[in-house]
Protein backbone atom coordinates (compact mmCIF):
# COMPACT_ATOMS: atom_id res chain seq x y z
CA UNK A 1 0.00 0.00 0.00
CA UNK A 2 1.08 3.55 -0.72
CA UNK A 3 0.67 4.66 2.89
CA UNK A 4 3.01 1.98 4.25
CA UNK A 5 6.45 3.31 5.10
CA UNK A 6 9.18 0.78 5.71
CA UNK A 7 11.58 1.81 8.44
CA UNK A 8 14.43 -0.50 7.47
CA UNK A 9 17.87 0.95 7.03
CA UNK A 10 20.43 -0.71 4.80
CA UNK A 11 23.58 -0.47 6.95
CA UNK A 12 24.74 -3.19 9.38
CA UNK A 13 24.04 -0.81 12.26
CA UNK A 14 20.47 -0.31 10.99
CA UNK A 15 20.02 -4.09 10.95
CA UNK A 16 21.14 -4.31 14.57
CA UNK A 17 18.74 -1.49 15.49
CA UNK A 18 15.89 -3.25 13.68
CA UNK A 19 16.44 -6.47 15.61
CA UNK A 20 16.85 -4.50 18.85
CA UNK A 21 13.35 -3.14 18.30
CA UNK A 22 12.03 -6.70 18.06
CA UNK A 23 13.71 -7.53 21.38
CA UNK A 24 11.73 -4.69 22.95
CA UNK A 25 8.46 -6.26 21.80
CA UNK A 26 7.95 -8.65 24.74
CA UNK A 27 4.71 -10.16 23.43
CA UNK A 28 6.29 -11.00 20.08
CA UNK A 29 9.33 -12.47 21.88
CA UNK A 30 7.02 -14.66 23.95
CA UNK A 31 5.19 -15.75 20.79
CA UNK A 32 8.53 -16.55 19.13
CA UNK A 33 9.64 -18.57 22.16
CA UNK A 34 6.34 -20.46 22.05
CA UNK A 35 6.90 -21.07 18.34
CA UNK A 36 10.33 -22.56 19.13
CA UNK A 37 8.89 -24.92 21.76
CA UNK A 38 5.96 -25.87 19.54
CA UNK A 39 8.47 -26.58 16.77
CA UNK A 40 10.44 -28.82 19.13
CA UNK A 41 7.28 -30.83 19.80
CA UNK A 42 6.33 -31.02 16.11
CA UNK A 43 9.85 -32.07 15.08
CA UNK A 44 9.64 -35.10 17.33
CA UNK A 45 7.89 -36.77 14.40
CA UNK A 46 11.22 -36.57 12.57
CA UNK A 47 13.49 -37.05 15.56
CA UNK A 48 12.33 -38.92 18.65
CA UNK A 49 9.19 -40.72 17.49
CA UNK A 50 11.04 -42.88 14.90
CA UNK A 51 13.48 -43.94 17.64
CA UNK A 52 10.60 -44.62 20.04
CA UNK A 53 8.74 -46.68 17.45
CA UNK A 54 11.85 -48.64 16.51
CA UNK A 55 12.70 -49.48 20.11
CA UNK A 56 9.31 -49.70 21.80
CA UNK A 57 6.52 -50.28 19.29
CA UNK A 58 4.70 -53.55 19.79
CA UNK A 59 4.61 -55.07 16.31
CA UNK A 60 1.14 -56.23 15.44
CA UNK A 61 -1.03 -57.49 12.65
CA UNK A 62 -3.87 -55.27 11.50
CA UNK A 63 -6.28 -56.71 8.94
CA UNK A 64 -3.66 -59.36 8.16
CA UNK A 65 -0.89 -56.81 7.53
CA UNK A 66 2.22 -56.89 9.71
CA UNK A 67 2.84 -53.44 11.22
CA UNK A 68 6.37 -52.67 12.40
CA UNK A 69 7.56 -49.45 14.01
CA UNK A 70 8.67 -48.05 10.63
CA UNK A 71 5.29 -48.83 9.08
CA UNK A 72 3.54 -47.25 12.07
CA UNK A 73 5.45 -44.01 11.51
CA UNK A 74 4.36 -44.01 7.86
CA UNK A 75 0.77 -44.65 8.90
CA UNK A 76 0.88 -41.77 11.39
CA UNK A 77 2.28 -39.36 8.79
CA UNK A 78 -0.33 -40.56 6.28
CA UNK A 79 -3.16 -40.03 8.79
CA UNK A 80 -1.88 -36.51 9.49
CA UNK A 81 -1.64 -35.62 5.80
CA UNK A 82 -5.00 -37.15 4.89
CA UNK A 83 -6.88 -35.41 7.69
CA UNK A 84 -5.24 -32.04 6.96
CA UNK A 85 -6.06 -32.26 3.24
CA UNK A 86 -9.61 -33.52 3.71
CA UNK A 87 -10.75 -31.56 6.75
CA UNK A 88 -8.96 -28.19 6.85
CA UNK A 89 -11.99 -26.38 5.41
CA UNK A 90 -14.37 -28.16 7.77
CA UNK A 91 -12.17 -27.36 10.77
CA UNK A 92 -12.01 -23.70 9.75
CA UNK A 93 -15.80 -23.59 9.39
CA UNK A 94 -16.36 -25.25 12.79
CA UNK A 95 -13.94 -22.94 14.60
CA UNK A 96 -14.68 -19.66 12.82
CA UNK A 97 -16.80 -18.35 15.72
CA UNK A 98 -14.05 -18.97 18.27
CA UNK A 99 -11.88 -16.12 19.48
CA UNK A 100 -8.31 -16.33 18.22
CA UNK A 101 -6.45 -16.84 21.50
CA UNK A 102 -8.77 -19.55 22.95
CA UNK A 103 -8.73 -21.36 19.58
CA UNK A 104 -4.94 -21.19 19.42
CA UNK A 105 -4.59 -22.43 23.01
CA UNK A 106 -7.15 -25.23 22.57
CA UNK A 107 -5.48 -26.48 19.40
CA UNK A 108 -2.02 -26.25 20.93
CA UNK A 109 -3.06 -28.17 24.04
CA UNK A 110 -4.74 -30.93 22.00
CA UNK A 111 -1.72 -31.16 19.68
CA UNK A 112 0.80 -31.19 22.55
CA UNK A 113 -1.11 -33.81 24.55
CA UNK A 114 -1.45 -35.99 21.45
CA UNK A 115 2.29 -35.79 20.82
CA UNK A 116 3.13 -36.39 24.49
CA UNK A 117 1.08 -39.57 24.61
CA UNK A 118 2.49 -40.65 21.24
CA UNK A 119 5.90 -41.01 22.88
CA UNK A 120 4.41 -42.97 25.78
CA UNK A 121 2.10 -45.48 24.10
CA UNK A 122 3.39 -48.43 22.09
CA UNK A 123 0.39 -50.14 20.51
CA UNK A 124 -1.07 -49.71 17.04
CA UNK A 125 -4.58 -48.58 17.96
CA UNK A 126 -3.43 -46.15 20.65
CA UNK A 127 -0.96 -44.54 18.24
CA UNK A 128 -3.54 -44.54 15.44
CA UNK A 129 -5.99 -42.61 17.64
CA UNK A 130 -3.27 -40.30 18.93
CA UNK A 131 -2.28 -39.42 15.35
CA UNK A 132 -5.88 -38.35 14.78
CA UNK A 133 -5.86 -36.38 18.05
CA UNK A 134 -2.68 -34.41 17.43
CA UNK A 135 -3.76 -33.73 13.87
CA UNK A 136 -7.05 -32.30 15.15
CA UNK A 137 -5.05 -30.04 17.43
CA UNK A 138 -2.96 -28.94 14.47
CA UNK A 139 -6.09 -28.18 12.44
CA UNK A 140 -7.45 -26.04 15.26
CA UNK A 141 -4.29 -24.10 16.14
CA UNK A 142 -2.68 -23.36 12.76
CA UNK A 143 -5.14 -20.77 11.36
CA UNK A 144 -5.14 -18.57 14.50
CA UNK A 145 -1.36 -18.86 14.77
CA UNK A 146 -1.06 -17.29 11.31
CA UNK A 147 -3.47 -14.51 12.28
CA UNK A 148 -1.65 -13.87 15.57
CA UNK A 149 1.66 -13.70 13.78
CA UNK A 150 0.37 -11.15 11.28
CA UNK A 151 -1.34 -9.03 13.93
CA UNK A 152 1.70 -8.91 16.21
CA UNK A 153 4.21 -7.78 13.62
CA UNK A 154 4.99 -4.09 13.29
CA UNK A 155 3.74 -3.27 9.77
CA UNK A 156 6.71 -0.99 9.16
CA UNK A 157 9.18 -3.74 10.05
CA UNK A 158 7.65 -6.85 8.54
CA UNK A 159 10.99 -8.05 7.16
CA UNK A 160 12.70 -7.75 10.53
CA UNK A 161 9.86 -9.45 12.39
CA UNK A 162 9.59 -12.21 9.78
CA UNK A 163 13.34 -12.74 9.80
CA UNK A 164 13.39 -12.93 13.57
CA UNK A 165 10.51 -15.42 13.63
CA UNK A 166 12.23 -17.51 10.96
CA UNK A 167 14.99 -18.21 13.49
CA UNK A 168 12.48 -20.26 15.49
CA UNK A 169 12.59 -23.27 13.14
CA UNK A 170 16.38 -23.79 13.17
CA UNK A 171 16.44 -23.33 16.95
CA UNK A 172 13.62 -25.85 17.30
CA UNK A 173 15.53 -28.30 15.08
CA UNK A 174 18.63 -28.03 17.26
CA UNK A 175 16.65 -28.54 20.47
CA UNK A 176 14.58 -31.40 19.03
CA UNK A 177 17.73 -33.17 17.86
CA UNK A 178 19.36 -32.69 21.26
CA UNK A 179 16.36 -34.33 22.89
CA UNK A 180 17.28 -37.64 21.25
CA UNK A 181 20.60 -37.63 23.11
CA UNK A 182 18.93 -36.52 26.33
CA UNK A 183 16.32 -39.28 26.01
CA UNK A 184 19.05 -41.90 26.36
CA UNK A 185 19.24 -40.96 30.04
CA UNK A 186 15.66 -39.85 30.70
CA UNK A 187 13.76 -42.68 29.05
CA UNK A 188 10.58 -42.57 26.97
CA UNK A 189 9.26 -39.28 28.27
CA UNK A 190 12.58 -37.40 27.98
Placement of each model-derived feature along the sequence:
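Pair of pore-lining "gating" transmembrane helices in MFS-fold secondary transporters
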Residues: 24-45, 132, 136
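Short amphipathic helix-loop junctions that connect adjacent transmembrane helices
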Residues: 47-72
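Loop-to-transmembrane helix entry/capping segments in MFS-fold secondary transporters
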Residues: 70, 153-165
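Helix-to-loop junctions at the C-terminal end of transmembrane segments
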Residues: 86-100
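Intracellular juxtamembrane helix-capping segments at the cytosolic ends
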Residues: 140-154
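A membrane-interface helix-boundary motif in multi-pass transporters
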Residues: 182-190
